[in-house]
Each structure stands twice: as structure tokens, then as C-alpha cells.
Amino acid sequence: MNVDYLFSTVQTMSRDYILTEFEEDRFDCIIIDETHKAGDESYHKIINHFKPKLLLGMTASPERTDGFDIYKLFGHNIASEIRLQDALEDDLLCPFHYFGISDLVIDGKEIDEKTEFRYLANEQRVEHIIEQTEYFGYSGNRVKGLIFCSRKEEAKALSDAFNYRGYNTVALSGDDSQEKREEAIERLEMECEVDNCGRPIIKSEVVKHNQPLDYIFTVDIFNEGVDIPQVNQVIMLRPTQSAIIFVQQLGRGLRKADNKEYVVILDFIGNYSNNFLIPIALSGDRTYNKDNVRKYVREGSRLLPGCSTIHFDEITKKKIFASIDRMTTTKKMLTEKYMQVKFKIGRIPTIIDFYKLGEIDPMLFINYAKTYDNFQRVVDKDYTVVFTEKEEQILAFISSLIIDGKRPHELLMLKMMLDGKSVAIDSFAKELVSIGEKFKEADYNSAVRMMSLEFVAGADANKFAQIELLSKLDLKSGLLKRSIAFLDKLNNTKFREEISNLLDYGMMRYKDMYANHDENNLVLYGKYSRKDVCRLMNWDKDESSTMYGYRIKHGTCPIFVTYEKKDDISESTKYEDQFINQKTFSWLTRSNVAIDNRESQEIINYKNSGLKIVLFIKKSDGEGTDFYYMGEVVPKSWMQKTIKNNKGKELPIMNFIFELEHSVREDIYEYLTN
């Protein structure tokens, strides 16, 4: 076959009688599309047969979930990589307007993964879908839509229901021939005259299979490998099982075409367990960090490049936030994400690799396995490093209490000691200033208490009781030096490297997330636990286990509010803490606190004592242990009230009206109060 360019399907080229027609060096360049499928035998046959000068693979979804290393086939050389957000920013795709719409509640039942078929094709649901498709519309002279369903019978029944109401649609699945699919695509893209409602004017002499289509209903096809530029409306009637598949289905409408300014994406969201995958897919955020995912639901359009928009209705937001709260990091998911990075870079990844590549948040490995190397040892047979029990304890201490980057002081101290330096207070101050931090003796002393484990309490104190990082003898003289035991451990090169990687990762987190802090060492709207607040506000000891709603100590009064309280808590703790507006917050003390109580008087007379009152809020206990930092507050008015305990007895309680230093940002305010 004497041609310069040869195009072939994999199925054809992999046939023995065709493949053997070509010598191994017949082609200078071989380009394989849909390369993520290259783990299949037919692809292997082709790749192993030829020896081109250039083998190039192209795919929109390189991440496989079956453990096959696609990158290895190409020597781990990534020529170019562009994600959805990059393509939108570079104007390579058609802008989209995404609307997350609550699916219908039928007979008191929400649509979910287990919903019976009779509800999926219910007349009420059909009317709801049609009403929304007509309301949100499309760009162009008529609708040309793809509708993704969860089941074949659902697709067929909905197609019949649409046709009964005057639409022209077909249902397709993997059971249908390629010819039937191509014919349907041609009919969907067909240009024709339309009436005032944008509906095709069908001439009586045109046979049905030549008439233009309004919609194609599909189940397990059209996710990939099909190009229909004219699609101007994509409707999703199925749960999101994978962020990859979501983007593939979204992408069916993102091709540019004449007379198409944008594509409308309608996502009918039921009570699905995987709803958290929707913001992950739309944002392209691969960290699986819950706060990042929540932020995208709150601020989606603001974070998208170009003129694309994202909107969730209020019921849908609630469903997605609830799904995010339930989101768990399983061993399977963590292993999958770990292996994807390992395959991508062609070696055992360090903790820094995940952060630099914008992949899964490395703190999830630590939360799951206590240390990153513990996780590696469990899931990666190529990882053969083994540390002693004491070394593991030190790594666990650094991983759980220091590397989150919420303060650089401990990271810097350890790094200086790792480099062999004894740390004098003046040399530490210079290093601190070099990274843009002001030196404060209180912060320095607090960091020393953490490093010497004086700050640590409770379960942490028991867990790390055998660790000694600092020489106690030198500590008394004001000099920080490595203890003999720690120095001995650092002779292990692998151990030293592991600590160095952890510290570098911690400093990256600090610079990206926490460097822009206020004088309280806290970032406005950053997330902090009670333990974090004890440390960052320079308390002598971790008193988080007994802090509860608030505590006045060391000239500070951190207040922690759970905005949506559980129904099963005692009557005397059902405080009605709430925003009056974005600048004003109504807060109740614990019960049995009267106006003449010492706590009340300290808050009332905050100016005289210099008491700093700082407010932290989380929406519900489903968010975990961390609270949003809302900044400093000052009392503007107060009143003694009463609250009943479980026995009906009236107890005194103080109601303070606080003015916030910073008016609450709109998206945070809406999230907390709605």
C-alpha cells in the first residue's frame, strides 16, 4: 500500500492478515487516538509490531482505573497536557452554561440510584424535564440535544414520551449498529426550516428516518470517540459515577460550530451518593480536598475562565454539600490516585510530587495511614524502605502536627536543624524574615514548646511520649540543638530525605495557603481546629479537648460556633447563635452565666484588658473538626436571658451582639446561613 498517510481503526489494523502486510519500520510516525484504551490486546498488537521514529498517543482521559500504566508505553514523556479549564481559558472550546437542577420528588420519593423504572419515566418527571429544557433553551435556530440516561429502558421510555409530545427523538445504546448511530447523528445535525418555537418544519413527503432529530437519548455510548459539533444542549439524567465520564459527557457539547455561541448543560440531580463528583469534575480540581470542593459549589462561576457559568439551585446545593460531608477517602480511591501519579512520572512519587502536579491532597494519605511512607508500604510493592519504630513515631509527629503549613516556625526550626545548624534565636529571626514573616518572641516560644512536646497533650502526648527532638540541656541555655537520639536517627539517609520532603511540602502549603495571615497567625476564612487555634494563638498547652464552645485565656477568647446544631443535644446547649447580617452576629454564652459572671465581665470590658475575641464558625458537624476563621469581633450590646435545661429549670445565659471586623464574604455567608 503506497500511501503517505494511512487512517485505520484499531480493530482493522490489529487483524493478523492486515498487520503482517506492513514491515515494522513502514511508518515514520504513528498516532494513536483514544490512547487510554491502549491497555487492550488489540492496541498491544499494533504497538509491539511497529517501530516508528515517533509514537504519539492522544487522549482526553489518560487516567485509567484498572492499574494499567499507559504512560510507560510512551516512555513517560508527556508532550503536551491541557485540561478543561486551560482549554476554556485559551478559547479552544465553546463556552458552556451549566445548571444543576433538582430532580423531581415523585410520591414523596427522591430520584436516586435505586429508583424504580416506573418513576424514571413517570409523566410528572417527563413534564419537569421538558419544562426545564424549554426554559433554559439553547444557542442556534433549533435544539440539537444529547440526553444521557442511566438505563436502556429509561432512555427508550423517555424518547417515546418526548415523541408523544411532539418532539422527534431516538434512543440509542451499545446494542445499536454503527450505521444506526451515524444516521441518528446526521439527523441531529441536519439543517432545516423551523417554526416560531424553534421546532423543525417537517414536510409530509419526508420519510421518518430522514427527518431531523431534536434529541438523542443514550445510555452507554457517546461518552467518547464521537464528534457532534452542532450539539447545543446536553442533558444529564443519570448519577455521576466518575468525574472522568462526567467531563466526557460534558465535552460532547463543547465543540465550536457555526451559529452556536454556547452550549447549555442541564444536570438533573437526584439524591445520589456521588454528587460530590460534580464540582470535582467541573472544577478540574483533583485534590479531593473537601474544602476545595465546597468552595467550587459556592463560587463556581467566579472560578471559571471566560464567559462560562455554573449555577446550582438551592435544593441541589444542599444535596451536593451533604454528599461532600459524606465523602470518604477509601484505600481503593487513594491507591488509584497514587498509582496514576506513579505511572505519570515513571517512578515512586514523593509527597511533593502530588502537590506540584495538583493531584490528590497528600494530607489525605496522612489522615488515612498516619504517615505517607506507611501508605506507600501498604500499596506499592516497589517501595521497600523500612524505618524503625522510633523513626516512624518522629515521622508521624511531623506529619500530624507540623506539616499542614499553618505556621512556618516549626518547619523552619526543623529544616535548620536538619542542615546541621544549632538554632539561636537571632539566626532563626533572620531566617524567618527571609521568608517574609515578622519575628515575634511569643510565636518563637510557642514553636519551641511544640518541638519540645511541652504543648502536646492528651492522646498525642501518649502517642509521642518517647520522642525527643531537642537537646534539653541546650534548650535551657536558649539554643536549639538536635538531641543525641534524633541526631543518631538522621544518620539514616532515607529517614533524613523523608523528613526533608515533608518539610518542603509543609513550606509549600504555608506559602500557598497561610502566608497571608493576620496578626493572630490566622487567615480570614481559613479552616482551623481547636487544636490549631491553641497553637497559633500561642497558648502554653493544647487545651482543645476541654475548650468546647469558647475559652478565655492568655488574653484571647476564641469562640467556636456550629451553625446548624444537632436535634439530640441537651436543651441547655441549644443556643440560637446566628448572623443578624453580614457584619453582625448574635452569640450566646454557655448556660449558667449571668451578667456579673467573671466571663461576662471580661468580654464586656474587653477594651480595658486588651482581650482579643475571635470567631470561628462551621456549618454543621458533617464538616468535621475544622471551623472557618471569621476574624476578630467586638461586643456592641449584651443582655442576660434565660434558657431551660432538660428538667425545665430556667438558667441564666448571656446574649452578646458582636460586630465583625470584616463583613462576611457573600459566598461564605450564603453557605453558612442557607
Please give the residue ranges for each predicted region.
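Conserved interdomain linker/interface between the two RecA-like ATPase lobes of SF2 helicase motors
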Residues: I78-C149
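Conserved helix/coil segment N-terminal to the catalytic DExD/H
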Residues: M1-C29, D40-K45
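Long, largely alpha-helical accessory region at the distal end of helicase-like NTP-driven motors
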Residues: G140, G145, R151, L282-K415, ...
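Conserved segment of the helicase C-terminal RecA-like domain
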Residues: A243-Q248, R252-L282
